[in-house]
Amino acid sequence: MTMKIASAEFSRGIKGTDAILADGVPEVAFVGRSNVGKSSLINSLVNRKDLVKTSNLPGKTTEINFFSINNKKCYFVDLPGYGYAKRSPKEKESIEKLILWYLMYSEAPIAKAVLILDVKAGMTDFDREMVRVLREHDHPLVIVANKADKLNQKEMSAQLRAIKEAAHEAVVVQYSATTATHKERDALLRIIFED
């Protein structure tokens, strides 16, 4: 499915598993550690600066947020970040359970999982575990090495090589949510929406 994004709007946010939005509309799940730029990436893809609230402080997204794309042709699903050390143990556990429940047990029709990494940090143990979960549940996966504008070409090549080795054959794309051109954005959308 190739898609040009003509409209994007907030649909709903959920904190509990009983309120999951599973209405048969295909979902693209954006997942990753806290502060890797998930919200900024979604804003970049829909070509808006303000659809998804962003913050420089990690751990601000604490619910699963659904955004209707092209009048419910699909949803972009912004999941809370995992691995944020400054959350209380109870809050951390609650958020991680919510993420895993959505990915492993909900009836959500996940068309693609987009795992966002901070290219500078590379793939962490948390990210490797997420790749394992996504593969075990047969979610088609693309890995976005975000914040590509923060590295020079030599550093970028080394980081991409290491990420690809750890990615177990998943497609890996370098990207910068803050500096991406229309061409780069359209190329990433094609990868996300291809079957």
Placement of each model-derived feature along the sequence:
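Conserved C-terminal guanine-recognition region of P-loop GTPase G domains, centered on the G4
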Residues: K97-V171
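Amphipathic alpha-helical transducer elements in NTP-driven molecular machines
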Residues: T61, K92-E96, L100, T124, ...
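Conserved G1/Walker A P-loop phosphate-binding module
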Residues: M1-K86
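Short, glycine/charged-enriched secondary-structure capping and boundary segments
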Residues: G24-V25, L45, P89-K92, R128-R132, ...
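Conserved nucleotide-binding/hydrolysis micro-motifs of P-loop NTPases
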Residues: K60, C74, G81-G83, K120-G122, ...
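Hydrophobic aliphatic residues
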Residues: L45-K49, L103, A167, I192
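Conserved nucleotide-sensing/catalytic segment adjacent to the nucleotide-binding pocket
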Residues: N71-I110
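Canonical P-loop GTPase G-domain recognition
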Residues: I5-D18, K150-D195
